[in-house]
Amino acid sequence: MSWQAYVDEHLMCDIDGQGQQLAASAIVGHDGSVWAQSSSFPQLKPEEITGIMKDFDEPGHLAPTGLHLGGTKYMVIQGEAGAVIRGKKGSGGITIKKTGQALVFGIYEEPVTPGQCNMVVERLGDYLLEQGL
């Protein structure tokens, strides 16, 4: 399966059969190279990936400044140290799951809930971890 198929079929999927889906998603290498993304995923800046990777290494690094992605600022909320970063902005937000080689991004807007976004992103991230990726 191609990386684009993982994005299209596992991240931009119909959530719970309700016709809802994430607003944007991507799979990005730890070096910031985009492996695959939805058409709506923002253009990443190198310093944004650097900050995200530093937060995985030093949990709490992004809390004072917020998480920036494509120039959008998210308030960092409780995640899982070294494994998951979660952010909130208005009625939407972001979940980032770290695997051995990649970062799995999911961005949501209402009516999709934070829990639904977490489930979709973390399910694929856990699968990739099981595959050694």
Curated annotation (Swiss-Prot):
Subcellular localization(s) per the UniProt record: Cytoplasm, Cytoskeleton
Stored InterPro entries: PFN, PFN_euk, PFN_sf, Profilin_CS
Record's miscellaneous remark: The variability of the residues taking part of IgE-binding epitopes might be responsible of the difference in cross-reactivity among olive pollen cultivars, and between distantly related pollen species, leading to a variable range of allergy reactions among atopic patients.
Keyword Disulfide bond: yes
Family: Belongs to the profilin family.
Oligomer status and interactors: Occurs in many kinds of cells as a complex with monomeric actin in a 1:1 ratio.
Transcription listed as a keyword: no
Posttranslational mods: Phosphorylated by MAP kinases.
Annotated keywords: Actin-binding, Allergen, Cytoplasm, Cytoskeleton, Disulfide bond, Phosphoprotein
Cystine crosslinks: 13-117
GO terms of molecular function: actin monomer binding
GO cellular component: a single term: cell cortex
PTM-bearing positions, type Phosphothreonine: 113
Name of protein: Profilin-1
SUPFAM superfamilies the UniProt entry points to: Profilin (actin-binding protein) (SSF55770)
Function: Binds to actin and affects the structure of the cytoskeleton. At high concentrations, profilin prevents the polymerization of actin, whereas it enhances it at low concentrations.
Motif (Involved in PIP2 interaction): 83-99
